[in-house]
């Protein structure tokens, strides 16, 4: 079976098996990570036979949301007008939120105790656990549903890159994404004579710690981003925290090898423990002291182990490695995180 056979996984619903739902999706309409996930959710729910109307979460007020919908999905709500001033009770209210650290603040939890929220959805057990760290009461059930892969990412031709190309993704949150470990490991490997092409995606090209390293400014249009992504061979991702970190499963679905921190939210969605090179974690660290919502600790990847695991990935790389990955495990990730499969999980909770 060729990979391209899975690229157009069109789901045709049975009209007799569907309970048609009218859904208001209150979301970020910009092309950021949550905006893209909300777009995939909307697309999936519509293809399952439901009516979905989107509202811009950053500008809409409580009194502006109209009645008449069965479900109101708030796709991330922290620090919006709706968070500070409340949400209406027209239908069933479902809030999707995340936890970048291992604890959600009392300010965030106050919202869930005093607003008419019926259900909470998070993208990982890590995020779910963070809601309970402070041991404050939470009246709603919390469900875990992973993010979806963008099906169009598989249609872009891989960019011609020097091989082996090791990719690091640092578009924001330098400390959380492990930027210090990335640049230091890259430099140490280069100084030791290892043959590889390091590439870092960053938002700030003036970052002084990038001096002497290959960097590309982000954000990029999807065709450019995924072509570059698919052209690389190894994702080096010594991340410290995050609620899901989709580059990990994107890399596996594109055939890359992955070197990533153990124990975080992303580790829950690896289909086989041997699919990645795990960086050991020795302790937790506090990095954020002024964040209103994410008040817990991050994981601290072991620097020496990060170095050694990237060395192992480079030692095991060969020109046919990508082809082998694409013909085997990549297929499994594309199917598991297909947007229709994820929309079906949402559908069960909305019903």
Curated annotation (Swiss-Prot):
User: What are the alphabetically sorted keywords of the record?
Assistant: Glycosyltransferase, Transferase
EC numbers listed for it are 2.4.-.-
Q: Decide whether keyword Cell inner membrane is in the record.
A: no
Gene Ontology MF, one: glycosyltransferase activity
Entry similarity comment = Belongs to the glycosyltransferase group 1 family.
**Listed name of the protein:** Putative glycosyltransferase 45
Its gene is SIFV0045
